[in-house]
Amino acid sequence: IVSISAAGIPVAISIMIAEKLANDDMRGVQQVFFVSLRVLAILGLVFSLALYGSAQWLVDNQIITDPRALIAIQLLSPAIFVVTILSCFRGYFQGFQYMVPTGTSQVFEQIFRVSSMVGLAYYFIDRGLHLAAGGATFATFPGVLAGLLVLIYFYYRQRNIREQMLSQQNPNAICESNGTVVKRLFSLAIPVSMANIMLPMVSLIDTFI
């Protein structure tokens, strides 16, 4: 889900939004964005809770061979939920070919992630290596949260532009159902994500060999 969100979802949303913009269909743009946001927020929450809940099972069944990784896995789970939402906003701005928000959010994301990683690892290092690793892993969460807040800020700033574009809505634009939007979203996102998933999958398989 992280690979799909990081790579496939922004590309898929940007393609769909660019098509709507080419047809002066701002209502369609809003539909693509909000439908994608709702669906991915639900999926992100489900996968986040599933990862947290299954962490102990993964360790008990030695799928994760080092039990000290339990805390790190559990602390990674909140970031999954935020990453899915973050990907929607990045895809939205990429569809407008407006890359300043994405670039700015990536800068803030790395600043908060690295500073949190160093700070938490340093704080917990004397309390145990597993806690230090967990703290460093958890640093992903404040990083992606900072990136998301930056994108929300840019989205709020664009409200006047959106209202102006809605007033120029193409009356002949075709209205798609929400189900069609969701199907197209994943039909575009999954193939793009396969390349990103292959390398982690190979590494995962290597751990079992």
Language model features with spans:
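Membrane-interface junctions at transmembrane-helix termini in multi-pass inner-membrane proteins
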Residues: 83-105
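Selective transmembrane-helix segments that form parts of the transport pathway or gating/packing helices
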Residues: 36-48, 189, 193
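Short membrane-interface helical motifs at transmembrane helix boundaries
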Residues: 46-65
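Alpha-helical transmembrane segments of multi-pass membrane proteins
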Residues: 64-89
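Interfacial transmembrane-helix starts/ends
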Residues: 27-41, 182, 186
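Hydrophobic alpha-helical transmembrane segments
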Residues: 105-116, 127-157
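Transmembrane helical elements of multi-pass membrane transporters/channels
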Residues: 143, 147, 151, 175-209
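Helix-loop junctions and terminal segments of transmembrane helices
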Residues: 7-22
